[in-house]
Swiss-Prot record:
One of its GO terms (molecular function) is metal ion binding. NCBIfam families: PRK00364.1-2, PRK00364.2-2, PRK00364.2-4, PRK00364.2-5. The gene is groES. Belongs to the GroES chaperonin family. One of its GO terms (cellular component) is cytoplasm. The keyword Amino-acid biosynthesis does not apply. This is Co-chaperonin GroES. Keywords: Chaperone, Cytoplasm. PROSITE patterns: CHAPERONINS_CPN10. It is found in: Cytoplasm. It comes from Methylovorus sp. (strain SS1 / DSM 11726). Together with the chaperonin GroEL, plays an essential role in assisting protein folding. The GroEL-GroES system forms a nano-cage that allows encapsulation of the non-native substrate proteins and provides a physical environment optimized to promote and accelerate protein folding. GroES binds to the apical surface of the GroEL ring, thereby capping the opening of the GroEL channel. The keyword Cell membrane does not apply. Transmembrane segments: none annotated. GO terms for biological process: chaperone cofactor-dependent protein refolding.
Length: 105
């Protein structure tokens, strides 16, 4: 069973935040906040305007996105916590630059 969002809805899987600091201190689950970044795993067909035309979504499956702390609705599917939100609740798409993708020697 999978989820298929409707209209301008987007399903996002949160990307887990790092649980240790640079100095090696482990941050417990109770002290850490939910991450505000995730990967789009499903999208709707787009927003329907009053005249009946459909506007396609800007985001696509696989995009890494940023969203507000209180954005969307949390749902559980197969024991996995997902976030369903409107495209307008997405603050931006994280784009990987070539510099980050290159292996540092």
């Amino acid at each position: 069973m999978s989820i298929r969002p409707l209209y301008d809805k987007v399903v996002v899987k949160r990307i887990e935040a790092q649980r240790t600091t640079a100095s090696g201190i482990v941050i417990p689950d109770t002290a850490s906040e939910k991450p505000e970044q995730g990967e789009v795993i499903a999208t709707g067909n787009g927003r329907r305007l009053q005249d009946g035309t459909q506007v396609p979504l800007e985001v696509k499956v696989g995009d890494q996105v940023l969203f507000g702390k209180y954005a969307g609705q949390t749902v559980k599917l197969h024991g996995e916590e997902l976030l369903v939100l409107r495209e307008e609740d997405i603050l931006g798409v994280v784009e990987a630059s070539d510099a980050k993708l290159k292996k540092v020697a």
